[in-house]
Amino acid sequence: MTGARCAFPVILTLWSAMAGASEFRHEILDFSDLRGWAEDDHAKALKVFTETCADMKDPDWQSLCALAQTGPEARTFFELFFRPVVISDGNPALFTGYYEPELRGALQPGGRYRYPVYRIPPEAREASPWLSRREILTGDVMSGRGLEIAWVDDPVELFFLQIQGSGRIRLPDGGVIRVGYGGANGHPYRSIGTELVRLGIYEAHQVSAEVIKNWVRRNPEAGEALLFHNPSYVFFRRVDQVSPERGPLGAMNRSVTAGRTIAVDPAHVPLGAPVWIEKEGHGPIRRLMVAQDTGSAIKGPQRADIFFGTGADAGRAAGRLRDPGRMVVLMPIQRAYAMLTDADQ
C-alpha cells in the first residue's frame, strides 16, 4: 500500500540545553528515512499504542488517542499525525532485552521450595538504605513476620527475578501467580557480570545471564559470594489483576506486549509514545514499538530495553541482546515542531 507522506520533506536539526548542562540534539525526519518502515505490521503497533494512550494526560496525545480508538488505517494514522524525531545526547544507541521469568514455587514451604519471595517490611520503606542483601539473607530480620508471598526452588532464578522486577511462579498444581516490583532496600545495584570480568573469570563478550547462572551453580560457595556482591535487594507484591495470558504490568500499570513494548528513560521519551526501533547486530529488528515501561539501568534518549515475553526461551533471547542501532520517537506534529520554538527561547 502507499502511505501518506509529509507534505514537505524536511530534516530540521536543533540543539537545546536540557537536563543540566548536557546538549541534546533533536532531528526531525521523514517516514521515508526509517529503514524498513513500509514492511512493518503497523496495525499491531497501533493496537499496543491504544492500550496505554488513554493514560497520557497531555492534550496533544489525548486527541491522537481518541482518533486511534476509532480504528483508522494504521500506517496512514501514524504518517498523518506524527513526525519521527531522533533525540540524541551524543552517546551511541544501545538495545538490551528483558523478559518475565517463570519460576517453580509453592504457597507453603517444604521439600525443594525453600527460598522465600518477600514483601517489603515497613521499616525498609522508611530507611534508605536499609539492610544489604547479605544482611537480609543471613540474618533473621524477615523471620516469623508473614512477609512471604511464596517459596521457590532456585535461589539463582530468584536473584534474576529481582533483576527483572516481576515474574510468574508456577505452582505444583499447575496454577500460576504473578508477582510485581514491591520496593527495594535502597542499596545501589552492582552487576555480578561485571564482577566476573573484573575477577578474570570471563571476558566481557562472554558474559550473559545463562553464563552467570551456570557458573554460580557450578561453584556454590563462590557463587553465593558473587550474588552477595550485589547489595541491592528487591521485594515483591502479588499481582492478581492481570490474567496469566497477558503480559506483566509495565510502568504505565498496563500489560506489556512481547516484541512491541520497550522500556525507556522517561526523562527523554514520553511513556506511551510510539518508538521506531532500528536494532543492528545479530538478528536486526526494524519495528514500531511503544514506550510502556522503565528500568533503573535505562538512561539516556538512545537507550531501550525490548520486552521478549515470558519464560526460559524469552529469557535466553533477552540475555543475548546487546546491540547498537537507532531509536526514533514518533511525536505529535505540533509537539515535534514546537521543539524549534523551545530551542529559540
Protein language model annotation of sequence segments:
Residues S16-G20:
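N-terminal signal peptide c-region/cleavage motif recognized by signal peptidases
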Residues F8-L14:
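Hydrophobic helical h-region of N-terminal Sec-dependent signal peptides
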Residues M1-F8:
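Bacterial N-terminal signal peptides that target proteins for export
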Residues S22-Q345:
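Solvent-exposed, well-ordered loop and adjacent helix/strand elements within mature globular domains
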